[in-house]
Amino acid sequence: MSLSNLGPGGVHSPLWRWVVERVWRLEHAFERSRAAARPEDDTRIRIFLVMGFFGFCFVGVSLGAGWSALFSRAGQGGGYAQGVEGARGDVVDRNGKLLAVDLAHYALYVDPREVWDAKETRAALGRALPQVPAKRLDKAVFGDHRAFVLGGLTPDEKDAIFNLGLPGVTFEEQERRMYPLGPTAAHLIGFVDSGGKGLAGAERALDDPIRKAAGGEGGPAQLSIDVRVQAALEDELRKAAEEFTPKGAVGLVTNVHTGEILGMASWPDYDANKAGGATDDQRLNRAAASVYEMGSTFKAFTVAIGLDTGVATAASTFDAREPYKLGYRTIHDYHATKAVLNLVEVFQHSSNIGTAMLAERVGGQRLSQYFTNLGLTKPAKVELQESARPLTPRKWDQDTVASTSFGHGMNISPLALAQAMNALLNGGEMRPLTIRKLPPGVRPEGRRVLSEHTSAEMLKIMRANVVPGEGGSGGKADVPGLSVGGKTGTGEKYDPAIRRYNHQRQVSSFAATFPTDGPLEADRYFVLILLDEPKGNANSFGFSTGGWVAAPAAGRVIERIAPFLGVKRKTELVTIANSPKNAAPEAGL
């Protein structure tokens, strides 16, 4: 072993200087005693000195090797220290962008029983650590037991104090979890406790593989999200929240074929580096842990079920000229058309009357079974342990069938809505959502819940609802050239204070997909924007419905993320969308 390895500083290290000093003192002690000693005593003293010298050398080399191993990380500036309690591996996005990382830091301790010169040690620490209160240093240096002095020292700060060569001053290496992007994707990434245990998000869901990665097993945990998509989603969601001041808001982007979550936002958000200082409301992952009555976005499922069961076609008609009386209740349309509507028009005008009539044709048993097949009666299948259980009807009577057909009487999470919408848009196959990146080209095996024909028809119907000038409720989400489709949703919230639904308290959303053209197997994405109790303003003419507050934000998200996802605008669609007859329609439910 070379002398350069005897701890930081090699032969110039404090440890090596200490060994040399001890040998020098022994040598001078020998010189002082030899004059008065008898010859045989002189020989014994020399033997003792030689043995002592080699003993000191052995101790020095051993300690130097140990100290070198202990503090090698500071010199190397990388890697994970084996055996560090709570150590975790890196977390990255689908493109390798760093999302979470362990950074080494050190805690400084003083053991007064091992201090050689208390006054010198106290003075040196006072100069090196001016931020530490004097009383704490006094207690640590002049006390009677080992005491903590300061934590959070960087490797450079630790080395500077170590090189002072102060016996009794020691360090303990610890890991601090850092999130380089701060609040970006905080709800999806999650956070850990002081011991390095995952408490939320991917940190909790993937706790075991992330811990194993710290030991070099399996590499970093790679999530499905794209930070470029995530940043655009969060930015537009924040703008919508600032404009319409809701209680909370949710944004989602998924790949409909793979179930990969490319972006997930919950507002208000928090900085994952300061999770302990965030409020419960900020830490709440509304995309996974909150459930809502989704309102008219459910009409997409009801229409698809009607087509799939064969009780209706796109040309089937429904008389919406008068309110529909069903048992003891009367169903109205928000924007009464007072017309006979075909199925596409029922969807475009978001007709409660037409949708309830369709659900009655389907029947309660079949409707509830389809909802179950679409995953709407169970928590969304995803790694996140926050995934909430829905609130579902106890019985499927005539009133329940009508209510659930247009999104009332069932509370589900936004993730559950996305999972079901994926099946609606990918050719009819149910697949779980995932927060982990899948290998390129891999599409998990799915369970068929709708026919390919039904899925293809729904893509056309959802596109018709967004095409400008066609009278659909989603026109404000259109992006020329990207073939956007979607469905607005405005669900009134039940108010216990008045024991009925309160039209002043709404959950407003827009469920979008793009591109709707091309074959069923073509790449396709789902986008959701949801605002909980938004407030209308002058820009929305006082309306707080999904078509006014959520659809525009969804369109802006799609326009920004399409280039990242490789979706190119098509010139012929730009021409159609910009034709003179296509004035923007009134956005509705």
UniProtKB/Swiss-Prot annotation:
The active site is important for FtsI localization. Its EC number is 3.4.16.4. One of its GO terms (cellular component) is plasma membrane. The gene is ftsI. Signal peptide: none annotated. Pfam families: PBP_dimer, Transpeptidase. It is found in: Cell inner membrane. It is a single-pass membrane protein. It comes from the Bacteria. It comes from Caulobacter vibrioides (strain NA1000 / CB15N) (Caulobacter crescentus). Interacts with FtsN and FtsW. One of its GO terms (molecular function) is serine-type D-Ala-D-Ala carboxypeptidase activity. The lineage of its organism: Bacteria, Pseudomonadati, Pseudomonadota, Alphaproteobacteria, Caulobacterales. Keywords: Carboxypeptidase, Cell cycle, Cell division, Cell inner membrane, Cell membrane, Cell shape, Cell wall biogenesis/degradation, Hydrolase, Membrane, Peptidoglycan synthesis, Protease, Septation, Transmembrane, Transmembrane helix. The active site is at S296. This is Probable peptidoglycan D,D-transpeptidase FtsI.
